[in-house]
Amino acid sequence: MAHILGIDLGTTNSCMAVIEGGQPVVIPNAEGFRTTPSVVAFTKTGERLVGHAAKRQAITNPERTIISIKRDMGTNRRIKIDDKEYSPEEISAMILMKLKADAEAYLGEKITQAVITVPAYFTDSQRQATKNAGRIAGLEVLRIINEPTAAALAYGLDKEGHQKIMVYDLGGGTFDVSILEIGEGVIEVLATSGNNRLGGDDFDQRIIDYIADEFMKEHGIDLRKDKVALQRLKDAAERAKIELSSALQTTINLPFITADANGPKHIDMVLTRAKFEELIKDLVEKTREPVETALSDAKLTPEQIDKVILVGGSTRIPYVQEFVKKLTGKEPFKGINPDECVAIGAAIQAGVLGGQVKDILLLDVTPLSLGIETLGGVFTKIIERNTTIPTRKSQIFTTAADGQTQVEIHVLQGERPLAKDNKTLGRFILDGIPPAPRGVPQIEVTFDIDANGIVHVSAKDLGTGREQKITITSQTHLSEEEIQRAIKEAEMYAEQDRKRKELIETRNKADSIIYQTEKLLRDLGDKMTATEKEQIEAKLKALKDVMNGEDKERIERAIDELTKSFYDVSTRLYQQGYTQAGPQGGTNPGGQGGTDGNVNTDYKVY
């Protein structure tokens, strides 16, 4: 059976895993790393880079490098590169395509299905955007699950007995907290809360601002206005943050960060852990309220929590760990990898859906209340937050005016009492209502939330049976036509990437035979006939002339011609008692010696 890929699509880094032999296994990317930077870049020559390659060139190409795109999922932001605009879904799809391709190379099979995680506090529009990104990347997204829930799956897979756990998930761009009950193969989410714009990126920004402000005081230059300098600051801030998790101080050294009339300027400063903690104190404090809300919604006290699990790279910060310990009165559990456990949980859920993992039932919840706008601009809730999903609930409404023949259903998500203060998910019209005095028609509004947390709404006039149904899509979403266009472009990009990789491999092969041929000419050129030497040099020049071109077939023909001449000459020299290693990647024309087995030589053909 084909593998279903479990994907943690993170703000800063992404990770993937599958079930192998009944157990979750993290898949390394093509570069050999277990996590992949969620970074996309476009070079000035039009090449697209994803992951480590994109991150490495960010300093020299900041304007064409896209980071933390997850924060823009579900919005109408567009990223303009040259004369083309990209949606957040399309950029996220590029990251997913990289993960998909690397997983296929690792597993040796085609991947078509995935389970993707999202922050528990993601809205419906953000979940829809994530699902669309999967489609564009060529993945059927079987399930969208919440990150803290995935972490709990990773933790609870082999646990016996009943436990109430808190998952404190502080990643690169989002914060979630979930309270769950685990026992007898059932993982039930009791409550969830969070902040979709709080994470390690914000910690980095505090360091950036601190360095820039100190530099401004000393030199009167604001480095934040210089895009290349700012990117260097971002890299330095991230490194400093990571180093301060294990060291009490770190040195930030950025030579030639800028220059003025007096010459080049450098940064060489020490950042202590104490100063870093002072810079981020108020940001960490912002996690207190969601934790208290989740506990309150779950009707539990900190004392009733058996285990606190830390998830997300930002929980490696000692100050965060100490804050959680003081807040909950519990020493946080550090027995799972905070960078990988969400992907592992996604793989377990994929295993459940694929039938590879048995006896696990996951009961998740909707993070925010859902309802509609009613008379006076009031938000009337139909499904309360922390309701177990999938779920379906209905409520009867009526008209607000005499003779009203249609009603607009304004669908909202949030917790504020007034409609204008909540997130609009969509609007639709139910018409054809027979004229009647206000308050007489009965209109049944039904909310249906599927296991992905995606909302479907219907409105039905009980008098006529007339009904309207929609799956919520807000104006920030890509239309079906736009999604199909993006899918075609993604397939085109994948084909371009494949051809590019083949071209690079062919050039590498050419480079190898050029090196071997030049070595042969240096070492044994005086043993060749004039004709042999002339032929090899001509074919060597022909290969050098074409190897940096874009025509792969032409390069391959030149390789074949040079290889043939190389072997013709080297075989003759070998038979005369000379030795020379053949070019890598060529076809072995001979063996290890003569047929009598008495020739003993170091001649090799790779």
From Swiss-Prot:
The modification Phosphothreonine is found at residue 174. Keywords: ATP-binding, Chaperone, Nucleotide-binding, Phosphoprotein, Stress response. GO terms for molecular function: ATP binding; ATP-dependent protein folding chaperone; unfolded protein binding. Residues 583-596 have a biased composition (Gly residues). Pfam families: HSP70. Residues 578-606 are annotated as: Disordered. CDD domains: ASKHA_NBD_HSP70_DnaK-like. Acts as a chaperone. This is Chaperone protein DnaK. It comes from Caldicellulosiruptor saccharolyticus (strain ATCC 43494 / DSM 8903 / Tp8T 6331).
